Amino acid sequence: MEKNIAEGMATAKSNPRVLIFAPCGYAALGLARLCESELESQVIGTPQTLPHFLETMIESKPDMVICGIDPRANVLPQLLNMPYYPSCRYVLLTDAESVALSRALQTAGFYAVIDKSMPLRKLTGVLRQALVNPSSGNIRRNARFYLPEERYILGALLNGERLALIARNMGIPYRSVSRYKHTALRRAGLKSINQILSA
């Protein structure tokens, strides 16, 4: 396995550009040092607010994005609807493992959702593998991933909006909103929105 990864790194883009979003400055510094020393990557930014992170992401189009945040801090809707670039790998570090959260975000295009307490060597291996593995391509043309409408609706539901309000804001029938909700949950292998909320 290590040989395959090493061979892949040799053919991968040299000095991949990594963007780190971690509101905790110490966490951001630790991740930056890890990326530069172990992954031979270029850290292009460590924004600590969501608006700055999204702005930097759009401007720089990184090769990998690492979000070292607690997804329960009312940012799940934004994570589901982040700008997506087919050549970029998205990794989320969380405070605790959750199958439901992993399924929800991997169906949104995240490469991995991992517990930040995992051993450093294992974390390094996951990040290295993320840079080596081929991307999923255009998620808007892949049936494994949410449709744009499904992303928006899941994000709105996680924000506490009701289906009727979402339908009015989108200008589509209530029944269509309900259908998008259920197809989104099925894609992620989930039964209800509460599985994500309780993660």
Where are these regions (language model features)?
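Residues within the DNA-recognition helix of helix-turn-helix
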Residues: 126, 180-183
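Charged, solvent-exposed alpha-helical segments that act as regulatory interaction surfaces
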Residues: 132, 136-140, 190
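Helix-turn-helix DNA-binding segment
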Residues: 139-179
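Basic, Lys/Arg-enriched C-terminal extension of HTH/homeodomain DNA-binding domains
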Residues: 185-199
